[in-house]
């Protein structure tokens, strides 16, 4: 069975840039039609490890995004590295996954109700995709710095700015393998400081942030040698 039926490349970004000590090849796979996925037909395409993980989700959306993200990774490994047999996952101290037997291949997965995303790179990488919706100001004030809150409150579409900032923070933390932590206000500092250059104040030179053309979701991706500031 051809798994590409279930994991179509809807958006591809490819670039080579001097980011580690050598040029780094990067590929982003994004599927924003996860509602079209036939989960039951796709389950046999998963490794036993991932299938059991998917089946632990009781809700359809969780199971669907788990399956879709895995299929994107599988497709990317086949097309970019010629890997036909899916490697086993190992997990770091904070739960960041890695591919057993392929230390030179770095990847990261993310999903929301609108889309799933997978990024592959020769360097450590972090990606986060989030749906754009009404934001909770109380949550924003707890997770955003004073400057970030100012940008949100001044924006014509504050929910989009909040989502951009949130995905940036998550991508940086996923790059380092930390995951979410108590203090999120100081994530975008140092080398990830906002607006030091680039397209505007809600941008970071080392982080690529993209809003879907239809405005349903935003994703951010960051590459580095280890995620330190």
Please report, for each region that a protein language model flagged, where it lies by residue.
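Core catalytic alpha/beta fold that binds nucleotide/phospho-ligands
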Residues: 5-229
């Amino acid at each position: 069975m051809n798994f590409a039926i279930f994991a179509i490349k809807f958006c591809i970004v490819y670039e080579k840039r001097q980011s580690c000590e050598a040029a780094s090849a990067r590929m982003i796979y994004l599927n924003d039609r996860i509602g079209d996925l036939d989960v039951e037909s796709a389950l046999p395409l998963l490794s036993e490890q991932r299938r059991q993980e998917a089946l632990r989700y009781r809700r359809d959306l969780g199971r669907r995004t788990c399956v879709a993200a895995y299929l994107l990774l599988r497709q990317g490994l086949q097309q970019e590295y010629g890997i036909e047999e899916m490697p086993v996952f190992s997990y770091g101290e904070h739960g960041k996954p890695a591919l057993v037997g392929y230390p030179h291949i770095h990847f990261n997965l993310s999903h929301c109700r609108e889309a799933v995303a997978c990024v592959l790179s020769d360097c450590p990488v972090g990606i986060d995709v989030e749906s754009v919706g009404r934001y909770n100001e109380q949550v924003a004030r707890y997770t955003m710095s004073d400057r970030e809150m100012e940008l949100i409150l001044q924006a014509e579409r504050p929910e989009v700015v909040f989502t951009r900032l949130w995905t940036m923070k998550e991508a940086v933390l996923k790059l380092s393998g930390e995951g979410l932590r108590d203090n999120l206000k100081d994530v975008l500092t140092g080398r990830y400081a906002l607006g030091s250059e680039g397209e505007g104040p809600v941008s970071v030179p080392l982080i690529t942030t993209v809003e879907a053309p239809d405005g349903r979701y935003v994703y951010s991706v960051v590459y580095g040698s280890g995620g330190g500031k």
